[in-house]
Amino acid sequence: MKPIPATPDHLGQHQESPRRKDKGEAESERQRTRERLEATLAGLAELGYLRHRQELLVKSALTPGAPTHGDTATRAGDTPRSLEEKFLEDNILLLKKQLNCLRKRDAGLLSQLHELDKQINDLKIDVEKTEEHLETDSRPSSGFYELSDGTSGSLSNSSNSVFSECLSSCHSSTCFCNPLETSLNLTDGQAKSADDFLEWLDYRDSQHETGTVRRSFSAPHSNSVDVAADVHPKYQCDLVSKNGNDIYRYPSPLHAVAVQSPMFLLSVMGNIKAEEPEEEIGPNDNDDCIVPELDHLKDEDSFLHQSSLCSLPLSSGKKMDGYILSIIQKKAHPVRTNKPRTSVNADPGKGILRHGSICVKQTGGVSQSSTVNLKNSKQTCLHSTGMISVDNSTYPSLKQCSKESLSEQLESKRMPSISTYPSCNVNELQSQNNSRNTVKSVCQGLARGSVAMTSNVQKENVTPNAPTNLSNASSSACNGSPRESTQMSALLPQEIKVVPPVKKISPKNTLLSYHASSSFDERPPLDFKSEGSSSQSLDEGLLVNAHYIPAQQQGVKLHKNIKNVKIVKSSTLKHRANVQYVAENGSQTLKEKSKAVGKKCRFPEDLDTNKKVKKSTPRTKKTSHPNFEPAVVGRNPVAVRSGIKSHGQPKDVVLAKPKHKRGDYRRWKSSAEISYEEALRRARRRAQREMMGVYAQVPFPYASPYAYIASDSEYSAECESLFHSTVVDTSEDEQSNYTTNCFGDSESSLSEVEFVGESTTSSDTDESGGLIWSQFVHTLPMQATATAELQTTAKAFVKIKASHNLKKKILRFRSGSLKLMTTV
């Protein structure tokens, strides 16, 4: 019986699979019927042989005529004895050969085969159920079950499994009869019960002793001529029960019945053509082969086979191997589900966490201004920072940042506002409109309305409106620290409602306009935690209360600041920040004064204005700073502590949290695989070494040159916190490329622009000049559309004194300042 191979058509074509299945079932049914008929014929032939042999025995006993009872008994005894001797000799030879064959076999193979039979039993049951289910199932067939049907060569029903166990035990009992191997290779699509077989076993137990054979001529393995001609030799071997205790001798009535049983049929199927002609032995030869005296060979009786079995051990072994291989193949190719073995982590938070500047939380602003929606805040955040704003759920740390930003905003609202802002508001509105329309307008607004913006922001801080807070939020978003970014995002929603047109502007213009608008619109208290002292100086500047300064005056000083920037030389932003912390407590106060009370971070315009304000009114700085001191403490205790440490004056304490911020930034950097701490330490060391020199360069007209520089230059760093501080720190170490690349292109470009605008004003008095880089970047996009003032400022920006590596990169990519960091 040939198994039906699983062809692609069978596996894939829905229409043909049922047709092929039906065809296979019909063929298997015909095969089973054929086998059953053959088994029945074999049983009948065996019974006929037994009857014929019995007749011969009776005739032999009665032939002498009428001898005396004793003579008859004696002759009968002599005749059987001579026959028994012959049979015994032949059987002994066969047994020896079989034992030799068994020695060559691996004993473990038989046990494994037995286990496989058990497994096959389970498989047969499963296949049986599956086939029944598939008959009514519209799903395409995989071909696995078709392979297992009656024509595929696998045992598929409980009867077969039971009988296969029998055969396996027979095998273990050294039964080399081909039926074993054939049965192992046979398959049946019909479920057949083993009850009949069990009944036969019980009947045999009642008739015979277990494992013993009566001393009679019915025992020998012999085939009549009819049997040899009509019955396949596979039906002419002994059947052994699964436990090996029950043996059905070939020429016995029970054997004939068992051969006809469906179970036996299934177990024996498929081996017909494997038999060799030697099995077709005449009745006389077979009678000679087996003798009743084999009873004493009880253990060896289980090995009794046809005389030809001894010559077939090799073929039987091959069949067994083939059967085992077939089982292994079927078990080695189980049906597999389409479910992917691995799950793809689509959590955007993990990838975003690597970019510290991306972490911007915008929910904080919602509470302050219900009119602003998160979407607008996100867009504003993107424009200001050039980064993707992250949802609150993305960063757990952002939640804390948003909370802090809210508290800071509330405090900023509480802060007293300076009464000199009406004109500033007008200027601010104009600057906002200009920034919305064009970058040029934005540049003009920056020149004219930085002070106005600052004063206006102070007003806004006093009022419950969150626009100032939004500005702070945006600036904090520019900063890399998660907390600051969160604050920025919180504030951005409100600020957005004022600056929505900025979205329409081109990337560079948008950034510039956003800076202008944010600086003009609001200077909300934002904690910019740039690395090193930049964040501290920014915070100080935020805390300072500044008197309103006319926009024109601010513009004039802006030019001056730019010139100063050219002159100033600082190794890094951090260095400048350190100098500012040490020497610019007073200037910081002035800067803060120029800023709105609630402002924490300053935009480039505000920074310049603050510087000018500080220069022009150091008194105001000093006076206003005390007003901010409580707010500073309330807003950010950590910043206050850091400010106290750096300045030694709680009054001048800045909200900046350099260490804490550095920790946050380092955390982001570590996720981006950037060793930020090392760069920061190097920047600090450089700043300390150059602190004295930078300090000398700082304009002393301000009571606290540090406050001026720190607020401006460090504000730039703060706004750029993640990006700029990282660039500065690493650029000195010539690692800016790596750091910059870690940030997104949009992120770095946006941060760059913002930083430029901010550091334009801040680095005017920036002794270290480390922040001039950002000024340069900011002014480059502004120069095209900026006024003459901005153009002059741009020139100053061109001469940036940052790390040599950073400066080189900036000059190289002047035209594409937005893409400076990413391209570098």
UniProtKB/Swiss-Prot annotation:
Question: What are the UniProt keywords, alphabetically?
Answer: Coiled coil, Cytoplasm, Developmental protein, Nucleus, Wnt signaling pathway
Motif PDZ-binding: where? Answer: 821-824
Q: What is its main location?
A: cytoplasm
User: Biological process GO annotation list?
Assistant: Wnt signaling pathway
According to the UniProt entry, the coiled-coil residues are 19-47
Task: Give residue spans, biased composition: Basic and acidic residues.
Answer: 11-34, 520-530
Report the sequence similarity comment from the record.
Belongs to the dapper family.
Q: List the disulfide bonds.
A: none
Q: Does the keyword Cytoplasm apply?
A: yes
- Which portions of the sequence form the region Interaction with tcf7l1? 2-343
* Oligomeric form and interacting partners: Interacts with dbf4, dvl2 and tcf7l1.
Please indicate if the UniProt record lists Secreted as a keyword.
no
The organism of origin for this protein = Xenopus tropicalis (Western clawed frog)
Q: What is the designated name of this protein?
A: Dapper 1
What are the boundaries of the region Disordered?
A: 1-34, 61-80, 131-150, 454-487, 516-536
* Function of the molecule: Involved in regulation of intracellular signaling pathways during development. Specifically thought to play a role in canonical and/or non-canonical Wnt signaling pathways through interaction with DSH (Dishevelled) family proteins. Binds to dvl2 and regulates the degradation of ctnnb1/beta-catenin, thereby modulating the transcriptional activation of target genes of the Wnt signaling pathway. May also bind to and directly stimulate the activity of tcf7l1.
A cellular component term from Gene Ontology for this protein is: cytoplasm
Location of the protein in the cell: Cytoplasm; Nucleus
| Recorded domain comment | The C-terminal PDZ-binding motif may mediate interaction with the PDZ domains of DSH (Dishevelled) family proteins.
